[in-house]
Swiss-Prot record:
This is Putative NADH dehydrogenase/NAD(P)H nitroreductase Rpic_0870. The keyword Ion transport does not apply. It comes from Ralstonia pickettii (strain 12J). It comes from the Bacteria. SUPFAM superfamilies: FMN-dependent nitroreductase-like. The keyword NAD applies. Its EC number is 1.-.-.-. HAMAP family: Oxidoreductase_RutE_HadB. Its cofactor is FMN. The lineage of its organism: Bacteria, Pseudomonadati, Pseudomonadota, Betaproteobacteria, Burkholderiales.
Amino acid sequence: MPMLEPSALDQLFHAARTHNVWLDKPVDDELLHTLYDTVKYGPTAANSTPARFVFVKSAAAKERLIPCMSAGNQEKTRQAPVAVIVAYDTQFHEQLPKLFPHTDARSWYAGDQAKINAAALMNGSLQGGYLVLAARALGLDCGPMAGFDANKVNETFFPDGQWKVNFIMNIGYGDAEKLHPRNPRLSFEEACKIV
């Protein structure tokens, strides 16, 4: 596999920023389909792909979501073209006969809800990371958020309890003029070991 050009790494990582202010430019539904059709190929344990994505675009759906957000995240969510509820399916293992057919992977989880939830959260979080990178690769900016009332989101959007919110991410076309200076990151020596 060839190494990506530096410009591609810049778009995905080095020059990419978390956005909180958005241009008044819509995100087409077709692009959201392309986004998911890219994300779904990211690796997960046993191809479990437990993440579920709710693309909140309409004014009516936004008005349901905004009261679930913390005060500091309400206006940015209102302004963003799309707010994505990144959720996970607490019954993802029921899809394993289709997604991982060469062995009985469903039996690894059946009847153990704690194990199901842990695997769903871990692998769904991986997929949420893929969503960030795929969005950036497709020319979109992202603003992941943890400031929301998870119980309220679940009650509002997932009343049957099968899906659970993991985090929420605004996507669209960010206003680069409104970015703050970039915060520092830990060095290799601070964050890594080679053993």
